[in-house]
């Protein structure tokens, strides 16, 4: 078995302990009958500042403020002739095309992996031993597609106009968050910084790359971890979300990437990285002594007929499950009927 003390990460254990010990100290000295909070808060971790929190009552005012700032900057850019209505409309083409193509690639790409490597179906929790290599593969492939599309559909001196579509889409995302998932309202923070970048782009012909990177930092620190966390936490079928978030993050970082002259070359570089990560994943795709094949074994009793069975989710029966199920186990649906799951 892999779940042994020797495989335990000491850093991971210390990390979990850093969560637990403050809670023990807090609750040990707190009246447990008075724990109910009057308000709900939004929480987000940021570098240097660490934990940032604010009440749910701030979400709508912040959303309204960001929307008004966005509209003001649009009118300001049009008035100063820094924005073009035609180019702003064209800016939706590379953005939506990248978003849709990468989403489709992420969804069907993982289904293709399951066809090429059927042994992955044996892993019930959905995250394979080489899962991190697949995340890297799909992320770099998404970047390659996005760089190639933006290289094809954008031109110089109109960088601010191409930033309107991503900002509008992020506003719509935050509107959906306000309605459906208020705990994720911290998504608005990188949009604030994006609007500052947008203002700088309208004021300066060639903004400082260092300043743009600084303003892009909140988006990187908040959204980049989510690209990995969704597949790790929910299984590799969520690679589609990683691909979509990669495009959304790329678009939010347009003030940095937009002024790159060699987007086509960067696309090729990303393809090379994607190829490397796919090859790496391929050589770690089989089960081995270090990457053991997982087994499932379920004890099932039909109380109506007072009969018991051994069942499994495994697609391939190995020596261990065979000793319980026999050499030719029958399909469990014949036993479970409508109770199968």
Stretches found by the model and what they are:
Residues 11-15, 19, 58-64, 72, ...:
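Short alpha-helical interface patches
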Residues 17-30, 57-66, 93-103:
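Alpha-helical transmembrane segments of integral membrane proteins, especially early/N-terminal helices
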Residues 2-3, 27, 32, 59-75, ...:
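Short, surface-exposed, charge-dense and proline/glycine-enriched linear segments
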């Amino acid at each position: 078995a892999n779940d042994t003390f020797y495989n335990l990460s000491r850093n991971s254990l210390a990390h979990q302990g850093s969560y637990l010990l403050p809670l023990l100290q807090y609750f040990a000295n707190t009246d447990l009958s008075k724990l109910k909070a009057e308000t709900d808060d939004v929480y987000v971790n940021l570098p240097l500042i660490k934990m940032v929190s604010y009440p749910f009552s701030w979400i709508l005012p912040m959303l309204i403020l960001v929307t008004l700032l966005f509209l003001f900057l649009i009118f300001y850019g049009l008035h100063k002739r820094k924005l073009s209505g035609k180019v702003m409309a064209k800016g939706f083409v590379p953005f939506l095309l990248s978003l849709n193509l990468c989403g489709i690639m992420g969804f069907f790409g993982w289904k293709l992996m399951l066809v090429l490597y059927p042994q992955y179906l044996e892993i019930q929790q959905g995250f394979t031993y080489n899962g991190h290599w697949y995340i890297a593969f799909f992320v770099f492939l998404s970047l390659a597609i996005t760089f190639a599309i933006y290289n094809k559909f954008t031109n110089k001196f109109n960088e601010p106009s191409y930033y309107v579509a991503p900002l509008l889409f992020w506003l719509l995302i935050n509107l959906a968050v306000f309605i459906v998932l208020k705990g994720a309202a911290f998504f608005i923070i990188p949009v604030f910084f994006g609007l500052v970048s947008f203002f700088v782009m309208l004021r300066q012909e060639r903004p400082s790359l260092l300043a743009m990177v600084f303003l892009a930092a909140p988006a990187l620190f908040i959204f980049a971890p989510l690209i990995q966390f969704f597949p790790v936490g929910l299984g590799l079928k969520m690679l589609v979300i990683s691909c979509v978030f990669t495009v959304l993050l790329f678009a939010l970082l347009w003030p940095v990437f937009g002024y790159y002259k060699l987007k086509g070359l960067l696309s090729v570089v990303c393809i090379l990285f994607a190829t490397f990560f796919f090859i790496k994943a391929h050589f770690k795709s089989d089960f081995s002594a270090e990457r053991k094949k997982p087994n499932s074994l379920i004890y099932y009793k039909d109380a109506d007929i007072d009969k018991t069975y051994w069942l499994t989710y495994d697609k391939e029966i190995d020596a261990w499950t065979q000793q319980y199920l026999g050499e030719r186990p029958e399909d469990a649906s014949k036993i479970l009927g409508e109770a199968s799951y």
